[in-house]
C-alpha cells in the first residue's frame, strides 16, 4: 500500500478521526443520506480497517508497518503496545505531538527539508526513533523558526502527553520518557492490527 496522497476527508469519513493525517473531522451524520445501508462488517474487514488507521494516521506504507510489527513481536512486552510505542516515538510523530507541525505529513516535510535538529545535529529521517532525554529543536535561522511558529500558533491547544515537554519560545521540545500507552494519539485497537498480520502470515 503506497503512502496515501488522496482526499483526506474521504478517509476520515470511513475510518473516523485521523489527527495525524488531518486536523479536520467529519460532521456528525454527514453524508449519511447518500450512503447505502451497509452490511455488518466481517471480522477481516474490522481488522483491515484498524490496520489502515495506523497506516493513514502515521503516514506509513504497508511494508513499513509490517516491519514495525515484526520488531514489536521480538521485543519484550505485549506486541500491540510495543508497536504503538515504536510509532509514537518516531521523530515526525514527536514533532506533531509537540505541536511543532500541524500534521504528520507536515512534520515529515520539516524533517526532510533539514529544518530539525536532534541533540544539536540535523536529522533528515522522519522515522528516526526518539529516545528519553532527546532534545528536538529547529535550526537557528528565520525560515525554520517561522515554520514552527506558524504551526504553534495555528495548532489547536491540546494537553501535551506526559512524555514530552515543549519550550515554545525556544522552538524546542524534550522527550522525557517512553510514551505510556494511555497517551497514544489515536483511538485504535492495536490487538486487531497484530491479529491482521498474524493471520496474513498463516494464510
Curated annotation (Swiss-Prot):
Key words, A-Z: Chloroplast, Plastid, Ribonucleoprotein, Ribosomal protein, RNA-binding, rRNA-binding
CC annotations in GO: chloroplast; small ribosomal subunit
GO molecular function per UniProt: rRNA binding; structural constituent of ribosome
InterPro entries linked to this entry: Ribosomal_uS4, Ribosomal_uS4_bac-type, Ribosomal_uS4_CS, Ribosomal_uS4_N, S4_RNA-bd, S4_RNA-bd_sf
GO BP term (any one): translation
Locations listed in the record: Plastid, Chloroplast
Main subcellular location of this protein, as a coarse class: plastid
Gene3D superfamilies per UniProt: Ribosomal Protein S4 Delta 41, Chain A, domain 1 (1.10.1050.10), RNA-binding S4 domain (3.10.290.10)
Record-annotated S4 RNA-binding domain positions: 89-152
Disordered: annotated segments: 19-43
Protein family: Belongs to the universal ribosomal protein uS4 family.
Subunit record text: Part of the 30S ribosomal subunit. Contacts protein S5. The interaction surface between S4 and S5 is involved in control of translational fidelity.
PANTHER family: 30S 40S RIBOSOMAL PROTEIN, SMALL RIBOSOMAL SUBUNIT PROTEIN US4M
Function according to Swiss-Prot or TrEMBL: One of the primary rRNA binding proteins, it binds directly to 16S rRNA where it nucleates assembly of the body of the 30S subunit. With S5 and S12 plays an important role in translational accuracy.
Protein name as annotated: Small ribosomal subunit protein uS4c
Amino acid at each position: 500500500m503506497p503512502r496515501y496522497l488522496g482526499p483526506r476527508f474521504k478517509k476520515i469519513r470511513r475510518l473516523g478521526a485521523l489527527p495525524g493525517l488531518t486536523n479536520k473531522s467529519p460532521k456528525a451524520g454527514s453524508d449519511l443520506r447518500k450512503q447505502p445501508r451497509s452490511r455488518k462488517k466481517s471480522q477481516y474487514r474490522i481488522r483491515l480497517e484498524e490496520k489502515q488507521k495506523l497506516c493513514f494516521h502515521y503516514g506509513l506504507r504497508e511494508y513499513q508497518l509490517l516491519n514495525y510489527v515484526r520488531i514489536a513481536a521480538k521485543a519484550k512486552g505485549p506486541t500491540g503496545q510495543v508497536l504503538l510505542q515504536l510509532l509514537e516515538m518516531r521523530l515526525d510523530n514527536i514533532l506533531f505531538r509537540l505541536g511543532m507541525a500541524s500534521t504528520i505529513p507536515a512534520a515529515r516535510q520539516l524533517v526532510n527539508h533539514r529544518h530539525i535538529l536532534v541533540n544539536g545535529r540535523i536529522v533528515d529521517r522522519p522515522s528516526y526513533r526518539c529516545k528519553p532525554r532527546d532534545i528536538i529543536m529547529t535550526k537557528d535561522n528565520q525560515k525554520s523558526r517561522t515554520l514552527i511558529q506558524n504551526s504553534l500558533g495555528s495548532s489547536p491547544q491540546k494537553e501535551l502527553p506526559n512524555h514530552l515537554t515543549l519550550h515554545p519560545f525556544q522552538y524546542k521540545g524534550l522527550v522525557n520518557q517512553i510514551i505510556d500507552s494511555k497517551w497514544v494519539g489515536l483511538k485504535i485497537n492495536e490487538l486487531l492490527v497484530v491479529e491482521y498480520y498474524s493471520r496474513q502470515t498463516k494464510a
